Each structure stands twice: as C-alpha cells, then as structure tokens.
C-alpha cells in the first residue's frame, strides 16, 4: 500500500495541514537521529555516503531514517548513477511552521464563558 505524503506539494502553508498530517511530521521529527539528518540537509542536497560519514551511522540505519522522513514529506530524493541524493522539502517545513504559528496565535484567545 503506497504511503501518502504528509505534505502535498504546492499547497498553501497550513491550509492542507490537518491534525493527522501535523502528527506525522512531528512524529518524524521526534527522533534525535532524524533531527540530525534534517540539520545536516539544512546546508543543501547531500549524498547518502556523505550523510553516513558525517553522522557516523551505518548505511542501513541511515536509510531507515531517511525513509521515514521521505514518507512524511520532509525530504525528496533523486538518483544519479549509483548515488542517491536527499534534500529538504521546504514546503513541508513551511506548512508545519504555519500550523504551529496558527496554534500559537490561538493560545492567546480568551476563554469563552461556560455554563
């Protein structure tokens, strides 16, 4: 069964980001290794071999984490010969940022009277 990415390319920031999609993104980002991968890719597209060396991870372990991030919609990849290059999907990060900003803005709203 194909995995639906959390973020649909080209959608306005948080309009397409519902609770399920936000949960998928936050879950993908909750792992310390995946955060290291995201930070490493903040400088631009990288080959898997570069990431394994920089992060000190076995290729199989890194591949698992890259798959989780890609399926969440946070990464894109391309193959060039026998190498696979990964890059961040800025749209996903912007949508998550927008969703968090809306959530933060709603925190300041006063409570409605009850009873």
Pin down the residues of each PLM region.
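Amphipathic alpha-helical dimerization/coiled-coil segments
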Residues: 1-21, 90-115
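Short acidic/polar alpha-helix capping motifs at helix-coil junctions
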Residues: 11-15, 47-48, 62
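N-terminal helix-turn-helix DNA-binding core of bacterial DNA-binding proteins
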Residues: 20-60, 80-93
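Short, structured secondary-structure boundary patches
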Residues: 25, 72, 82-84, 98-102
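Alpha-helical residues within the helix-turn-helix
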Residues: 53, 64, 70-71
């Amino acid at each position: 069964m194909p995995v639906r990415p959390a973020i649909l390319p080209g959608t306005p920031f948080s309009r397409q980001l519902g609770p399920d999609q936000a949960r998928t993104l936050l879950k993908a980002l909750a792992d310390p290794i995946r955060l290291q991968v995201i930070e490493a890719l903040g400088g631009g597209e990288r080959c898997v071999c570069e990431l394994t060396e920089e992060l000190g991870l076995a290729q199989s372990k890194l591949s698992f984490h890259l798959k989780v991030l890609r399926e969440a919609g946070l990464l894109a990849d391309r193959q060039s010969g026998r190498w696979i290059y990964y890059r961040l999907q800025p749209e996903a990060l912007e949508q998550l940022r927008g969703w968090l900003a809306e959530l933060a803005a709603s925190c300041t709203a006063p409570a409605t009277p009850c009873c």
